[in-house]
Each structure stands twice: as C-alpha cells, then as structure tokens.
Amino acid sequence: MTREPDSTVEQQHGNGHLENGTEQDTLDFSRQIKTEDLSEALQTGIPHRPCQLSQASMMGGGQMTGDFTSLHPLQQLVLVPSHLQSASQYLLSQSQSGQQGLLQQNHLSLNQQQGGILQPQTGLGLASQAVGCPGLPGSSLESHLEMGHLHAPKHFSVVPEDPSDLEELEKFAKTFKQRRIKLGFTQGDVGLAMGKLYGNDFSQTTISRFEALNLSFKNMCKLKPLLEKWLNDAESAPSDTALTPSTNYAQLSEMFGRKRKKRTSIETNIRLTLEKRFEDNPKPISEEISMIAEQLVMEKEVVRVWFCNRRQKEKRINCPMNIPLKSPVYNSRMVPTSVSLGSMSMTPVHNTMTSTVTSSCSPVSSSRPSSPTSGLEPSSPGSSLNSPKPTVNTSSYNNSSSWYRWNHSQYFH
C-alpha cells in the first residue's frame, strides 16, 4: 500500500516534466516562426517528438486521457512541419515508385483527420512559413516548379528542324517548272533522264505532282536534290557543247531525255506562196514538195506537213456544203408524180377539153360516180382525196378528162 502513493508521485512528477517539455516546445516553435536562423535545428529535433508522445501515451492510460486535450497545441506544432515535409517530398519524389506516393497521400489524409478543427490554423502556419522562410521546404516548391518549367521545352523540341521547309520547296518547284519549260523538256523526259543518269526512274505523274506540290513533305524532300542536280546538269550541258564541238546532240538528247519540237512559224509572204501552190495542186507529190522547199528555202518535212494541214482545213471548210440535204418525206412522193406528168401527152387534152369541162366544173359531179365515158375506175374522186396518196390508173393517161379533173384548180377548192 505504501508503494502506490510513490508510484502516483512518480507519475505526477513525470507529467510535470512532460508539461514543462511541452511548454518548452511551444516556445521553441514560436521562435521558429519568428526567426529564420533556427530552421535547421528544428528540422532535426522535431521528428523525435512523436516518439515522446507515443511513449507518454503508453504510460498511464486513464490519466493521459484527461491530459490529452492539453496536448492539442503540441499535436498542432508537430503536424505543421510534417505536413510541409510530406508535401515537399510528394512533389520532389515524382520519379519514385507508386507505392511510396500512396503511403505519403495516406499519411496526409490521416494527419488531416487527426487535426480536425485545427486545419485553418495549420493553413495559416503554412502560409506564414511559405512567405517568411525561404529556406524551408515551402520555397523548394517554387524552385521545383521553376525547374519543371525550364525542363518542359525539351519534350517539345524532339523533332529537329529541317533545312528545307515548305516555302523553299514551293519556291524550288516553281523555278524548276519554269526552267524545265525554257529548256524544252517535258515531265516525262525528266523522269526518264533521271532514271538513266541516277538510277531512280520516275514517272511523269510524279514530276507533275512535285511541281503542283501534291506530294508529301518527306517525298518532296527526297526528290528535291535529284531534280536540282538534273536541272544543273541540263543547264550546264549546252555550255559544255559550245566548248567541245565534238559532243553529239543525239547523245545529249539520250542523256537528258527527248526534247520537245518547237512550233514552226511561217512568214506571211511564204504562206501566201504556199496558198497559191495549194490552189494549183492541193496534193503534190514528193518531188514537187522538194522543189517547193528548195524555192522557199524551207525543210521538206515542214512543207509536207503544211500541205497536210491545209488539206484538212479545206475539208473542214467545205464539209457542210458538200453534205447532201436529207430528202423529206414528200420528195419521194413528188418525184414519180412529176415524171409521170411529164411523160403524158398533151394532145388529147386539147381534143377533149369541151367534153370534160361540164363534168368537172360542177361540185356535185365530183361526189357522184363518174360516167362510163370518163375512163376512170369505179371509185369516186372524192374518196381518193381521203387517202394520203391517190392511185391513178394507167388507162387514165389516155383520157384527158381524168387528168384535167385531178389537176384543175377548182377541184381542190
């Protein structure tokens, strides 16, 4: 029984020392906020304080619960630096494993749950330390952000810059087309010449797409040096031939492709002479063509081609005049009628005119069947008008009354 008061006295004595220690800690931490020189000493001493709390909590259970409320300032003082260290470690240790990052996040959430009502005060402490103490981990956040901002452009500048950009390619394609036309080469000639010279055979479509900028950027960059080399060789070839006359033009044409034939322009006086010769003989023979070429000091092939083109032009000019008109439907009907009328003899008409006038002049007689002396078939002339083509009996050609009845003007009225 005597030992129990001694133990309680020792516990109270220990609690007194603990309270003295907490007061001393609060003073030290307040000095840490006001002064910047004690930052390193506090960082080394603060991590040991949670161990003292754990040892003290293991001592008297009932009595420590009563004094636990008095230790809230100490918990606040301990939580502030640990929160700062964990935040700085979380930002600085991005290259570490994911498990360590998860543990730090859990530690932050536990500290926030234990703090409870003390979160606004810890926020104020964080703001004050971040502003007043550049040596603390708060300043390391800004330095880390600045370092990250400096290292960021390295990720975007991965692709190196190409010396030949789109503007240079567009300019080269335009100049290449102009110089190629000036030299007299076609797009197909360029493709064949590049195949003979450099071993890279290109089609006419590829050269056309290059000049029109319809190829991809990568293919344009590959094709540009080859075309530039061919263009320089083609332009320097005539100057070399002037220096060395032994060089044959056929060899150059085989090397750089087939040159396009230039359009022949004929003078006005020569054209008039050729027109006169064409009026005399539109289709001269080979000997006459050679004689005309010698007289006009021209090539025989040029004269021959001119006569061929002139004959084609003459066909185009005279073609609408020579085409016969399509005969209409009534033409085929009128031709045999006119022939038959022209072949009839007019002598019976004068002989029997008086006998047929009375029968043809009356409109009633046209609707009635004719008399046996008329020489027509039993069908009446009124019914024959309804048919599209009247049928005339061959025996009526000998009788003048039938012919007069068909051709008299009053009959149609």
Swiss-Prot record:
CDD domains from the UniProt entry: homeodomain
Keywords noted in UniProt: DNA-binding, Homeobox, Nucleus, Transcription
GO terms of biological process kind: regulation of transcription by RNA polymerase II
Bias (Low complexity) ranges: 354-398
Sequence segments annotated as region (Disordered): 1-26, 346-398
GO function terms (MF aspect): DNA-binding transcription factor activity, RNA polymerase II-specific; RNA polymerase II cis-regulatory region sequence-specific DNA binding
Classification via InterPro entries: HD, Homeobox_CS, Homeodomain-like_sf, Lambda_DNA-bd_dom_sf, POU, POU_dom, POU_domain_TF, TF_octamer
Signal peptide from the UniProt entry: none
Domain of life of the native organism: Eukaryota
Cell compartments where the protein resides: Nucleus
Domain POU-specific: 161-235
Gene Ontology CC: nucleus
Residue spans binding DNA: 259-318
Matches recorded under Pfam families: Homeodomain, Pou
PANTHER family: POU DOMAIN, POU DOMAIN, CLASS 2, TRANSCRIPTION FACTOR 3
Purpose of the protein: Transcription factor that binds to the octamer motif (5'-ATTTGCAT-3') and regulates cell type-specific differentiation pathways.
Family per similarity comment: Belongs to the POU transcription factor family. Class-2 subfamily.
Protein name per its UniProtKB record: POU domain, class 2, transcription factor 3S
Record organism: Xenopus laevis (African clawed frog)
